[in-house]
Structure formats: C-alpha cells, structure tokens
C-alpha cells in the first residue's frame, strides 16, 4: 500500500458514555476489527451472511445465547489489561473513540487499549478471555500463535490506526500465570488482501444490498445462520423449483451421504466389537467400580462408576400435562426444528 506510512486515523465518534444502541448504529457504518474474520469466512462465531444482515439491521446476533460469556469478558477486561502491564512493564491506556481509516472510511476500529513501548512507539493491546480447554487454540505444533480469527482483527486494527504491532493478552484461568501474551507485527501483503476483501464485501454486498454467498466450511454455522434468518417454517408455502445449480449441490450431498453410510457400517461394527470387549471386562469387575492391571511395561486403571441424572419420561410428561397443565405450561418449552429429507421421485411415463 503506497500510502502506508502517510496517514493518521480519523475519529468517527467518542465512545465514552455512548449508549450501546448508538454504538451499534455507528458500528453499522462500516467494518470493525471483530468483523474481519466473518468477511474472510474464517470466523467460528458467525458467517459473512450474518455480518451482512447485521450491517443492514435485518437480523442481528442473539447475544442472549452467550450473554454470560460476553459479560465475563467485559468484566475481566480491566483485570487482564492490568496483568499484561504487570508482566511486560508497558504503560497501557485507553483511547475511547471509534476510529476510521482516512482512505477507506468503511474500515472502523474500536480498540481495547494502547501500549506505550520502551522505544517510544505505540502498540495496540487486545484483551481476550477463554476457558481452559480452548487455550490450545493459541498453540500450533508447540509454537505460540494467535488464532486466525483474532489475527485478522489485529491486522485490521493496524491498517486503520497505521500502527505496526498488536499484542494480545488472553486469560484462561484465575491466576497471572494463566495469561498468554502474543504479538503480531504488520504484514503489508496480508493487509492489502484484507482491505480488498473488505472493500468487496462493503461495496458489492452491503451498499448494493446483495447477500454474500455462504463460503464457510462449518456447515453448522451456516444452518444456524439460516435458522435465525428464515424463522419458523411455512407449511402452506408452495414447493420451490430447484435449478441445475441446486441439482449439482443435491447430487454432491447424496454422494456424501452414501460415503457416510459406507463408513457408518464400519463404525457400527467397531462399536459392537468395543461393546463386546467392554462387556467381558465388566463381567470380570462384577459390582466393583474399579479394576487395575499392573504389567511389566504398562499399567492401567479401569473405572466403571455409576452416573445418576434426573429426568422425566414421555408418559410422565403427558400425565403432568393432563393433571397439572399450569405447572406444565410454566416449565415446558416447545422448540421447533426442521427435518431435511431427500426422496427420489419415480420417472413419469412420456
């Protein structure tokens, strides 16, 4: 990018005390750092189509589904920033503004913190929290990494702010030792490609109100996106006539189902063999919950512990509905899902 070192970010709006609804309205004026992964099709949280709907305020993400996770992240942000400052010795501070790229006004940045480095330069600091099991996303083959969906966020911010370094501090436990610090430096080739893809998303989809195609590899993410957009099924709607494009998709789907069916037969046989061997071991254990094998080269401990859970049978649920409808209606929720099924029609005689 020819003007990489010749610009300063513009301030779109001050965020100190800005009501959330107004903040969201300003975010819809462009693409933010946390939007970048969805534009690239690498977000584990939402699709590019979800982002498109959000920018046009058609369908927004349901924060109620993960409100605890969002609230924990917000509450812990100052603490994690303090941990970063303590570990590095860098001075950190906030700049409570939503920034805008002067050359690409649809590129926005709302930063967590800034860090003042010993050489007098400034870096961006992004705060993250995760659970213990997800900490492995910050490693690859024993090497420290930044997850690609967060990397795109950091590189977006570097482009907007014209800053050459981003630090991430991610807390996965309840002690200072369970905070990971990662650093990425500016990559102009990555940045140019990111800007081109974001420009295409903004100008050719958002501004023209043309939904982007689903390009994500995660089918569950796509189905959840469609569920939010489409809502309940309409049983009175006429059948939809599919064209050649959809026939190609259908043919591939049927082929994959056949492959899965063949593999499932092998899996089913393996499951039966595993259960047979498990039965032999359980027979030897009897009523004991533990068994031990002590060999010369290796040792094993088997546990077969009881697991109890509360539940209610379908028959009991029907009796509850009949005898105590007030209690039933208070605690039972009815959810709707749609079953996808393909049936090959018989060819009609000419």
Predicted feature locations:
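Metal-dependent nuclease catalytic cores that hydrolyze phosphodiester bonds in DNA/RNA
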Residues: 1-124, 131
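Short, hydrophobic/amphipathic alpha-helical patches that form generic packing surfaces
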Residues: 49-54, 159, 254-257
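Nucleic-acid nuclease catalytic cores
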Residues: 70, 86-111, 115-206, 344
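Short alpha-helical basic/polar micro-motif
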Residues: 82, 155, 254
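Extended, charge-rich alpha-helical segments
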Residues: 103, 251, 262-350
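Short, positively charged
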Residues: 189-238, 311-350
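Contiguous, amphipathic alpha-helical segments that mediate oligomerization or scaffolding
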Residues: 208-214, 220, 227-294
């Amino acid at each position: 990018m020819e003007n990489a070192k010749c610009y300063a970010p513009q301030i779109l709006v001050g965020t100190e005390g800005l009501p959330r609804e107004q903040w969201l309205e300003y975010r819809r004026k462009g693409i933010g750092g946390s939007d970048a992964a969805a534009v690239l099709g690498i977000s584990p949280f939402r699709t590019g189509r979800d982002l498109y709907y959000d920018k046009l305020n058609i369908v927004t993400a349901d924060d109620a589904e993960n409100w605890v996770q969002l609230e924990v992240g917000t509450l812990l942000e100052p603490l994690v920033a303090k941990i970063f400052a303590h570990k590095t010795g860098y001075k950190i501070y906030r700049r409570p503004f939503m920034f805008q790229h002067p050359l690409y006004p649809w590129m926005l940045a709302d930063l967590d913190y800034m860090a003042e480095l010993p050489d007098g330069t400034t870096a961006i600091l992004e705060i993250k929290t995760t659970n213990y099991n997800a900490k492995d996303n910050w490693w690859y083959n024993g090497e420290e990494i930044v997850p690609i969906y967060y990397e795109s966020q950091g590189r977006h911010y570097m482009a907007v702010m014209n800053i050459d370094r981003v630090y991430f501090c991610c807390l996965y436990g309840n002690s200072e030792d369970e905070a990971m610090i990662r650093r990425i430096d500016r990559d102009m080739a990555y940045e140019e490609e990111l800007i081109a893809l974001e420009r295409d998303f903004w100008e050719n989809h958002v501004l023209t109100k043309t939904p982007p195609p689903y390009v994500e590899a995660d089918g569950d993410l796509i189905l959840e996106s469609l569920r939010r957009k489409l809502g309940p099924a309409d049983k009175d709607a006429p059948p939809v006539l599919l064209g050649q494009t959809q026939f190609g998709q259908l043919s591939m789907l049927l082929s994959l189902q056949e492959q899965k069916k063949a593999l499932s037969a092998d899996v089913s046989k393996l499951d039966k063999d595993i259960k047979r061997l498990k039965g032999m071991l359980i027979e030897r254990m009897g009523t004991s919950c533990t068994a031990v094998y002590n060999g010369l080269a290796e040792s094993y401990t088997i546990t077969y512990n009881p697991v109890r859970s509360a539940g209610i049978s379908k028959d009991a649920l029907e009796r509850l509905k009949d005898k105590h409808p007030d209690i039933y209606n208070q605690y039972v929720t009815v959810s709707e899902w749609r079953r996808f099924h393909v049936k090959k029609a018989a060819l009609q005689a000419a």
